[in-house]
Amino acid sequence: MKVVQTKDTMSNIYLDAVRIRHQVFVVEQGVPLSREIDKDEAHCIHFVLYSDKKEPQGTVRLLPLENGKMKLQRMAILSEYRHQGLGKILIEEAENFAKNQGYNTILLGSQSTAETFYEKLGYTAYGDPFEDAGMPHIYMKKTL
């Protein structure tokens, strides 16, 4: 298993990330494609987790913000690979990357159904719940 990253939106790594996100968010959850692929794509660092057989299994992206913060977005694991600890591996890789780049805080907007997952990784909820793409979400953050 290996996590790789890219900022190159023409790379195969990025295309694997988009394929995973399309399957999870557009096909499974009904998020409009126009909302899934956004203006921030070229500004993000895209991470993809590959199996030992080089099959893409999951993805997440980080959007650099100001004041030592990064926003974790588009966390997705393909359905056949869920509940195996792969999400934790991806998040930890993204956090390590952010910390090594001098960032000290990760922010995210979690689907409410994933709140417990992020809490187990040290994230805390803040602010009021909100709706995004027709689904309830909660703001969360973690100091690195």
Which ranges hold each PLM region?
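Glycine-rich ATP-lid loops
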Residues: 79, 83, 103
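Conserved acetyl-CoA-binding loop-helix of GNAT-fold acetyltransferases
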Residues: 83-96
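Short acidic/glycine-enriched loop/turn segments that link adjacent beta-strands
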Residues: 41-43, 68, 132-136
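Conserved GNAT acetyl-CoA-binding A-motif
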Residues: 91, 98-111
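Conserved beta-strand in the GNAT
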Residues: 48, 55-63, 71-76
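Conserved active-site alpha-helix within GNAT-family acetyltransferase domains
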Residues: 100, 112-128, 133-136
